[in-house]
Amino acid sequence: MVGRGRFLAVFYHESSPLANKTQQLGYTLWDAADFRVISRGSVSCLSKGSSLSWVGFNNDLSLMVMDTDGMLSMLVTTGQDSNYETLLWEWAPVLDTVGLRKSTDDCHWPVTVHDGKLVCIPLKGGNTYPDATRRPVTTTLGLRMPLAKSVLSRK
C-alpha cells in the first residue's frame, strides 16, 4: 500500500506465483478524496521470474513500480473505453537499471521519482538493502524508455 496527496494504491496477490516464480499481482488505485476507484487491474509489467520490490508516486502523482530485475514502470492512461466513460490504463516501462550496473551483483535501491529522475541508492557487492549504520549516498538516474536491441546492433 502506498499513498500520496489524495491518491492511494493497494497491491495484492491475484493468485499463486507462476512456475518461474513470477508474482501474479493486482492493484487498485483510489482517489481517497472522492472515495472512488480510478483504476484496477494486473501489475503486468513485472519481468519474468521477478517480484515487486518498490511502489511509489512521483512528484506528478503518477504511480510507479520497480521489480527485482531493476525495471521501473509507470501507470499511464492509454485512452477511453468504447463508451467514453472509463479511462484505460497500462504499465509502461520507463527505466531499465540493468544496463546501468557496473557489476551483476550491483542494484539500485529506489527512494523516489522526481522530475523525470529516479533518486536511488546504488548498492554494490550483492547487498540488497542500504547499510543502516551509515548515511547513504543517493544518485539520480534519468528516465528513458527501454528499447529492444535489433539483431543488427548485436553484430
For every predicted segment, state its role.
Residues 5-7, 60-61:
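Short coil/turn segments that connect the beta-strands within blades of beta-propeller domains
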Residues 14-16, 21-155:
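Intrinsically disordered, low-complexity regions in large eukaryotic scaffold subunits
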